[in-house]
Design a protein with these regions (language model features):
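N-terminal cofactor/phosphate-binding cores enriched in small/glycine residues
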Residues: 1-2
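Short glycine-rich, Thr/Ser-proximal phosphate-binding strand/loop in the N-terminal lobe
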Residues: 7-16
Length: 269
């Protein structure tokens, strides 16, 4: 959640996807839309700020994600790839754009009506993979290379985040394919043949970079928790006078995991 005023100034410090302060807003929007709205989505952060009566909301001229912000600085274009945009606001699978019915529902909420902006006016434009997302400007080139050697004019694709990048990198963008990303957070992405028939709060409905519907299962913690456990094992060993190489320790633990049951003993996150 990165909201900006009309001068392009950031109104509040960047609120990341791990900033789980939007429980009230996420629950209310999920009920209003009959569509699961996770706490980390941009629209949940915006609505929570409204419910909290935060002063900055009245000044918002534009809000975006980190990927959208960087792209804006490089090209001057206020756009997002559809996969990244689906983590800001629900996407209509047929139009591959924001769900217009839900846009109207949001604007009609009593707490929202007092603001002069309409939601669609402050959201980035949605683009699908392959569309022109602008070119590197002189200002953008200087941000990347202060020496001035990098030339402007390079065409850029619609900006996506790590989820869209992972789908493309693993060739998991076709229907009935999927991938798992294990990093700071961990999540599974499965490309669906058709939309779900009911709301499941365990499943976040997002899209591929080309706009196909994806069911996402997301957990906030992965390697951060793992690092804590590995650190504990190292500390244990060192207390017995054993010097441990962290690379070797990680390697042994990862390889040991391969000996486990294929269903992880029934363990479910």
């Amino acid at each position: 959640y990165m909201p900006f005023d009309g001068k392009g100034e950031l109104l509040v410090p960047f609120r990341t996807w791990r900033n789980t302060i939007t429980g009230e807003a996420a629950a209310a929007l999920t009920k209003e839309f009959s569509f699961n709205i996770p706490q980390r989505w941009s629209i949940a952060h915006l609505y929570q700020a409204i419910l909290n009566g935060e002063e900055h909301v009245d000044k918002i001229a534009y809000f975006t994600t980190l990927a959208g912000y960087i792209h804006w600085k490089l090209t001057g274009e206020k756009v997002l790839g559809v996969g990244e945009a689906s983590g800001m606001f629900p996407i209509d699978a047929k139009t591959r754009d924001y769900n217009r019915k839900m846009l109207a529902q949001f604007d009609a909420l009593p707490a929202v009506g007092k603001y002069t902006w309409k939601l669609e006016e402050i959201l980035p434009k949605v683009l699908v993979a392959g569309e022109n997302a602008g070119t590197l400007t002189e200002e953008g080139a200087k941000l990347l290379d202060p020496s001035g050697r990098l030339e402007a004019g390079i065409p850029l694709c619609p900006p996506e985040g790590d989820a869209g990048t992972g789908m493309v990198a693993t060739n998991s963008v076709a229907v009935r394919t999927g991938n798992v990303s294990a990093g700071t957070s961990v999540f599974a992405m499965v490309v669906l043949e058709e939309d779900l028939k009911a709301v499941h709060e365990e499943l976040d409905m997002v899209t591929t970079p080309s706009g196909d519907t994806v069911a996402m299962v997301h957990c906030n913690n992965c390697t951060s928790d793992l690092n804590a456990w590995v650190g504990l094992f190292r500390e244990f060993a060192e207390n017995f006078g054993i010097n441990v190489d962290m690379n070797e320790l990680f390697g042994k633990l990862y390889n040991k995991a391969l000996e486990g049951d294929k269903d992880c003993g029934g363990l479910l996150a």
